[in-house]
Design a protein with these regions (language model features):
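N-terminal Rossmann-like NAD(P)+-binding subdomain of aldehyde/semialdehyde dehydrogenases
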Residues: 2-155, 432, 535-539, 550-566
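Conserved C-terminal structural/oligomerization subdomain of aldehyde/semialdehyde dehydrogenase
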Residues: 4, 12, 17, 43-47, ...
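ALDH superfamily catalytic-core signature
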Residues: 48-53, 246-385, 447
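Rossmann-like NAD(P) dinucleotide-binding subdomain of oxidoreductase/dehydrogenase enzymes
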Residues: 145-283, 534-539, 551-563
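Conserved residues at the C-terminal ends of beta-strands
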Residues: 167, 224, 242, 291, ...
Length: 570
């Protein structure tokens, strides 16, 4: 680790001399030995969370499975009624929910209301507004593409997948758990949801919300590793999990065991890239630090590290410090808006990373890390190399490593050498930003901002590769939790028996050559791109001519098939 004038080393960051002792280990042992009433520590002490008895989990699953097979959730009116009850429960328990999140991770109630509670309430309203339209079948003009489907009717119905499990996370314990639950219910599924035991106050408050709803439609399982393990053994039709990649693989294996669908919202190291042609560094600094310090950096789409063009670094760093001061003051530990680390184990992990880095600490505040308060101040680390300890894992902390680059392609190469991130932020002129997006992969990408894309419920949120599988919010949640069921309806009287023999054996022999030729024209006519002549392309371009083009074939088939039909009758 290096130090410079006006910069500090790591030692003032630690207030407790035993900062690196994992005093949380006994708590985890206690969690595993007392399943009925478990004391779980949080930012403001402990909460006694009642875990679901393991022996009850299969019966809870059976109850909601029966609720689905009863067919009540196929009714749009019943779904809407449950969504309204959901909304009623949220509003009745709003204060309890906001208080609970504050007790768990010291997140300001106003912040929780803005980014979590309001998001769920809005999502319910979106589904109540659009459920009728989104549930309508899609109708496709079959005969216009393939003449064999003349007089047929095809539709794609949006049907519920069945019984769904949603496993939430502690860092946004209302939003992350309840947004997918809203989509699953609106799509007609029944749900078992599992709140995070690391946010015990919120887990208990969420369970009170569910009491306003039909228990055959939605239930809650509380618990830790053992309870979750048993829960994942149930034969759910879809598994939805938000959390880290290690547990994500466990959930994926559980889904594979039942050949069920799975959605994984994971994370990764989401970079912010600041290129030399960006127009104004002040909003750049503000938006980066907002995403970095919100919820004390414990956000899956927070800026994990900063890639900045060498020519801008010295100008940007003091602006980053100013942005932190503007949001949380010069003593963020005293700020009502600055969060806390979720538990001692996470606090210790973060402090070990700060000890291991070889970067240079930039003076942001005189506040020191405080284990008893689970507080870590904003930390900016300059001069970080690609192989630094801070670059080995997702930080999930109020730490911003800064890496400089000389060319945009150098920054792109570094992003591509790592796992695909959940989010990618680019601050640059339009052409440069498009160059980055076109040459990288990420779950989402934002130009000239960070984090704010989470507020959009008309676009998909999800990862790619190690950062996740699938997506959700709004219409995309409805699609995730729906099975697209293709239904084809055909008349018995058409086509005529002679023409209908085109698709049936025998196919071989010269006498059946007409079948092969007519069948190809009817079922798989050459698409326009595969036709050679302009004339044939014109006929394909005008869909109705596809139908007219096979009429002579129909007539020929009728004539040639009459003797065959007569012989069969004899």
């Amino acid at each position: 680790m290096t130090t410079q004038e006006n910069k500090v080393d790591s030692s003032p960051l630690v207030k407790n001399e035993h900062a690196y002792v994992d005093t949380n280990s006994k708590r985890h042992a206690d969690v595993n030995t007392n399943k009925e009433h478990t004391a779980v520590s949080g930012a403001l002490g402990s909460s006694e969370l009642t875990y679901t008895p393991v022996s009850d989990i299969s019966s809870i699953f059976d109850a909601v499975r029966l609720g689905f097979t009863s067919g009540t959730q196929r009714s749009l009116s019943h779904r809407k009624q449950q969504l309204r009850q959901f909304l009623r429960g949220l509003r009745e328990e709003k204060k309890a929910l906001l208080d609970a999140v504050y007790f768990d991770i010291r997140k300001a109630r106003e912040e929780t209301e803005l980014f979590e509670y309001n998001a769920v309430e809005y999502e319910i309203g979106v589904f109540l507004d659009n459920l009728d339209a989104w549930s309508q079948p899609d109708h496709n003009p079959l005969a216009m593409q393939q003449p064999a489907f003349l007089l047929s009717r095809g539709q794609v119905r949006k049907e519920p997948r069945g019984t769904v499990v949603v496993v939430g996370a502690w860092n946004y314990p209302i939003r992350i758990l309840l947004l997918p639950v809203v989509g699953a219910l609106a799509a007609g599924n029944t749900v078992v949801m599992k709140p995070s035991e690391l946010s015990p106050h919120t887990a208990a408050a969420v369970e009170r919300v569910v009491r306003y709803m039909d228990p055959s439609v939605i239930r809650v399982v509380q618990g830790g590793v053992e309870e979750t393990t048993v829960l994942l053994k149930q034969s759910f039709d879809h598994f939805f999990y938000t959390g880290n990649g290690r547990v994500g693989k466990v959930v994926a294996r559980a889904a594979a065991e039942h050949l069920s669908g799975v959605t994984l919202e994971l994370g990764g190291k989401s970079p912010s890239i600041v290129h030399a042609d960006v127009s104004d560094l002040v909003p750049v600094a503000t938006r980066i630090m907002w995403s970095k310090l919100s919820n004390a950096g414990q956000t899956c789409v927070a800026t994990d590290y900063l890639l900045v063009h060498r020519s801008l670094k010295d100008k940007l760093v003091p602006l980053l410090v100013d942005a932190a001061h503007a949001m949380f003051g010069r003593s963020p530990q005293k700020s009502l808006d600055y969060g806390r680390i979720v538990n001692t184990r996470s606090w210790t992990r973060i402090m070990k990373l700060l000890t291991a880095t070889e970067g240079t600490f930039v003076q942001v505040t005189n506040d020191e890390a405080d284990e008893a308060d689970l507080f870590i101040p904003p930390v900016i680390v300059d001069g970080v190399r690609f192989d630094d300890a801070l670059m080995t894992e997702e930080l999930f902390a109020p730490i911003l490593p800064i890496i400089t680059y000389d060319t945009l392609d150098e920054a792109i190469d570094f992003v591509n050498q790592n796992d695909q991130p959940l989010a990618l932020y680019v601050f640059a002129a339009s052409q440069s930003a498009e160059h980055v997006i076109s040459h990288t992969r990420s779950g989402t990408a934002v130009v000239n901002d960070t984090f704010f894309h989470l507020a959009s419920h008309t676009n998909p949120f999800g990862g790619v590769g190690p950062s996740g599988v699938g997506n959700y919010t709004g219409k995309y949640s409805f699609d995730t939790f729906s099975h697209q069921r293709y239904v084809l309806k055909r008349p018995l009287w058409f086509p005529s028996p002679g023409v209908d023999t085109v698709r049936m054996p025998p196919y071989s022999g010269k006498e059946n050559e007409w079948k092969r030729e007519l069948g190809n024209r009817m079922v798989y006519p050459a698409p326009r791109a595969l036709r050679d002549s302009v004339w044939s392309r014109l006929f394909t371009f005008v869909p109705f001519w596809r139908v007219l083009a096979i009429i002579p074939g129909f007539l020929a088939a009728l004539i040639s098939a009459k003797p065959l039909i007569r012989r069969r009758k004899e």
